[in-house]
């Protein structure tokens, strides 16, 4: 989750988020190099005493500043396209989770099991435990196994919502009448926080998402207890 004075992205908890962070750093490095080069050229232009009154055109320099940006854009576009295809790929999921956005809470259904569904509301500040996170903790967490391919189906019951968990690199719009899907793979246990990322009304800020990633054997026990109860 985000912490105070954190200038970077959240620590990744999935392979896709690691790839997104690598691409961010790759693009940022190129932007810094361009900024330094342009700044240096502007500095040299403003603070030198050389004047060429007879310079009308320069085919060489024009060719350079046309071809060089095209090459730079290719270095950005190729990894970006690779990531787009990776993010859109569904790899034989072990578990399917369905998320339904409401004003202003989330409903969840475990489609592979019978009668496992619940609503997830934000815990109000006056009911929050001393070790809880304000505006982020919920009464019912999503329990998911680590090291398993997970598919999530997202829709909405009223207005457009967006199911977002930054540490997993997941952001899926929930649109009424439409079922969107994506997949993710959690590679470590822990709690991962997210929020609705589409303005959906007065209480848009009070729709947190909490995923609890656990080992597979603990997940099976939780499923068994939920089915029996």
From Swiss-Prot:
Record's bilayer topology term: Multi-pass membrane protein
Function: Component of the cytochrome c oxidase, the last enzyme in the mitochondrial electron transport chain which drives oxidative phosphorylation. The respiratory chain contains 3 multisubunit complexes succinate dehydrogenase (complex II, CII), ubiquinol-cytochrome c oxidoreductase (cytochrome b-c1 complex, complex III, CIII) and cytochrome c oxidase (complex IV, CIV), that cooperate to transfer electrons derived from NADH and succinate to molecular oxygen, creating an electrochemical gradient over the inner membrane that drives transmembrane transport and the ATP synthase.
Cofactor: Cu cation
Main localization category: mitochondrion
Protein's recorded name: Cytochrome c oxidase subunit 2
Binding-site residues, Mg(2+): 198
GO annotation, cellular component aspect: mitochondrial inner membrane
Record's subunit section: Component of the cytochrome c oxidase (complex IV, CIV), a multisubunit enzyme composed of a catalytic core of 3 subunits and several supernumerary subunits. The complex exists as a monomer or a dimer and forms supercomplexes (SCs) in the inner mitochondrial membrane with ubiquinol-cytochrome c oxidoreductase (cytochrome b-c1 complex, complex III, CIII).
Keyword Nucleotide-binding: no
UniProt binding sites for Cu cation A1: 161, 196, 200, 207
Keywords: Copper, Electron transport, Magnesium, Membrane, Metal-binding, Mitochondrion, Mitochondrion inner membrane, Respiratory chain, Translocase, Transmembrane, Transmembrane helix, Transport
Origin superkingdom: Eukaryota
Listed transmembrane segments: 27-48, 63-82
Any GO BP: ATP synthesis coupled electron transport
Record's cofactor remark: Binds a dinuclear copper A center per subunit.
Gene3D superfamilies noted in UniProt: 1.10.287.90, Cupredoxins - blue copper proteins
CDD domains for the chain: CcO_II_C
SUPFAM superfamilies (alphabetical): Cupredoxins, Cytochrome c oxidase subunit II-like, transmembrane region
InterPro entries given in the database record: CcO_II, CcO_II-like_C, CcO_II_C, Copper_CuA, Cupredoxin, Cyt_c_oxidase_su2, Cyt_c_oxidase_su2_TM_dom, Cyt_c_oxidase_su2_TM_sf
